[in-house]
């Protein structure tokens, strides 16, 4: 996970927002995120539905690359839309 964490510098947390481990949501609630991907997101500093809901297209691609996921998968699985909806339900 250290290799993944080093890629966090390429992600704009000014847009995503900053969260801590204490604030983490169960990201596996989002379709397309399993335990291994959730751990990779946590390693990047992405802990909450709100952060995922704040992703722009560019950030989706950066996250996709950082977690070494199939190209376009974050967008195709609509993580941003799901993150927004789950954050509103909290």
Identify the residue ranges that each predicted region occupies.
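C-terminal extensions
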Residues: 1-31, 35-90
């Amino acid at each position: 996970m250290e290799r993944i964490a080093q890629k966090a510098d390429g992600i704009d947390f000014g847009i995503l927002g900053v969260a801590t481990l204490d604030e983490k949501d169960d990201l596996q609630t989002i379709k397309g995120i399993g335990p291994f991907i959730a751990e990779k997101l946590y390693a990047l500093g992405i802990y909450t539905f709100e952060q995922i809901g704040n992703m722009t297209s560019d950030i989706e691609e950066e996250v996709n690359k950082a977690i070494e996921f199939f190209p376009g998968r974050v967008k195709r699985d609509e993580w941003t839309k799901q993150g927004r909806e789950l954050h509103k339900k909290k």
